[in-house]
């Protein structure tokens, strides 16, 4: 689980920008290119964000995206021209599990989906949402109120917004 009652260390502006890119579904190499950084620098920033936000050291990109959004460190992705995404109960359960767990076994237990079927079910959900990948799915789930609906996000977008936004 990603919930923690411990206070977080605030992120720097650069960490917020990299976090926003993660929420938009960009890979480390895409982030490095967009921000004119080395791949190792991006990896380092992501590791530091996990520490500052009290995520497990090997937390998935989806768990990091959810934590960034839940703690209001980055704004959710803006709605792009796409159909409205309303997952069924199983889809909602899978989204919540992907947002909270990094290990396939934990996700399978939380959803009741066999481990062997997780990849297929996740890929279908990503396509239905019009997302680029699972971290982007988590971002869109926050935008659509599927996750984090308890209060609106007040974080300000990073300067210039994420590159390739809404692709």
Can you name each region flagged by the protein language model?
Residues 28-57, 103-135:
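Recognition helix of helix-turn-helix DNA-binding domains
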Residues 54-82, 127-167:
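Basic, Lys/Arg-enriched C-terminal extension of HTH/homeodomain DNA-binding domains
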Residues 23-24, 69, 96-100, 142:
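Short, locally clustered residues in the helix-turn-helix/winged-helix DNA-binding domain
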Residues 15-18, 22, 91-98:
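Short alpha-helical "packing" element that flanks the helix-turn-helix/winged-helix DNA-binding module
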Residues 12, 16-17, 32-36:
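N-terminal intrinsically disordered, low-complexity, charge/repeat-rich segments that act as generic
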Residues 10, 24-27:
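Sensory/regulatory domains in signal-transduction proteins
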Residues 96, 105, 138-139:
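Surface-exposed interaction/gating patches
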Residues 2-13, 74-91:
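Regulatory hinge/linker segments at domain boundaries
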């Amino acid at each position: 689980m990603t919930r923690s009652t411990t206070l977080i260390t605030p992120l720097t502006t650069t960490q917020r920008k990299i976090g926003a890119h993660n929420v938009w579904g960009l890979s480390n190499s895409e982030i490095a290119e967009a921000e004119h950084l080395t791949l190792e620098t991006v990896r380092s920033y992501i590791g530091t964000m996990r520490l500052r936000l009290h995520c497990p050291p090997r937390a998935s990109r989806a768990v990091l995206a959810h934590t960034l959004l839940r703690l209001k460190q980055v704004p959710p992705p803006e709605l792009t021209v796409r159909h409205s995404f309303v997952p069924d109960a199983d889809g909602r359960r899978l989204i919540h599990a992907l947002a909270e767990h990094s290990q396939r076994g934990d996700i399978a237990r939380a959803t009741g989906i066999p481990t062997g079927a997780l990849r297929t079910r996740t890929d279908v959900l990503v396509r239905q949402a019009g997302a680029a990948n699972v971290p982007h799915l988590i971002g869109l789930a926050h935008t659509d109120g599927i996750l984090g609906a308890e209060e609106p996000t007040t974080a300000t977008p990073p300067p210039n917004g994420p590159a390739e936004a809404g692709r």
